[in-house]
Amino acid sequence: MLSGKAAYDLFVYGSLQEPEVVYVLLNRVPDHVSAVLSGFHRFRLKGRVYPTILPDGTGKVNGKVLKGITDDELKMLDEFEDVEYDRKTVEVMLTDTSEKLQVETYVWKNKDDPDLYGEWDFEEWRQHDKEDFVTATKKFLENRRLPEAKTRMDTFKTFFKQDLENGKPLDS
């Protein structure tokens, strides 16, 4: 039985599209459907392996809607997304049915962040960064149990070493 009461629908557009990452965090993979968020752009972040979105008025971001997220699961995901993101309610269109749906998603707090650039690609991430990201996510969960728990940001900073010349993470 799932803990928590309310059921939320959550639009994910980066690493949380990967079932293995979601399973590590929630101990299950919720039902999900493909969706498009209009009026936003998905950015790369210099020195990081995960993306973010910001409203731009014209763009489209492809992703998935995770269905039936509980209060406890949403709390876990809020903690994972950490202080860099705000959770907002947005409208997406489901790819298969064109149905419009109000969902939660995580939006980058700092719209003027100088580290924002380009377009983040999920398939490229899966090929190059997924394995290390899953390992770092497991480390985040381990660190949460410590008396002085580390945030996801702190865990990932210590897990990934950065090649500052090209902004790509290196294995630790």
UniProtKB/Swiss-Prot annotation:
Q: What induces it?
A: Down-regulated by biological stimuli.
Any single Pfam family the record assigns to this protein: GGACT
Q: Name one GO molecular function term.
A: acyltransferase activity
Q: Which UniProt keywords apply?
A: Acyltransferase, Transferase
Entries under Gene3D superfamilies matching the protein: 6.10.250.210, Gamma-glutamyl cyclotransferase-like
Query: In which tissues has expression of this protein been reported?
Result: Expressed in flowers, leaves, stems and roots.
CDD domains given in the database record: GGCT_like (cd06661)
Keyword Hydrolase among record annotations:
no
Instruction: Detail which positions bind substrate.
Output: Y13, G14, S15, L16, Q17, E18
Per the UniProt entry, the Enzyme Commission number(s) are: 2.3.2.-
Protein origin, superkingdom: Eukaryota
UniProt key word rRNA-binding: no
Show the disulfide pairing. none
Q: Which residues are catalytic?
A: E81
User: What does this protein's UniProt record list under function?
Assistant: Putative gamma-glutamylcyclotransferase.
Q: Which family is annotated? A: Belongs to the gamma-glutamylcyclotransferase family.
Recorded protein name is AIG2-like protein C
Q: Which organism is it from?
A: Arabidopsis thaliana (Mouse-ear cress)
Q: Which gene encodes it?
A: AIG2LC
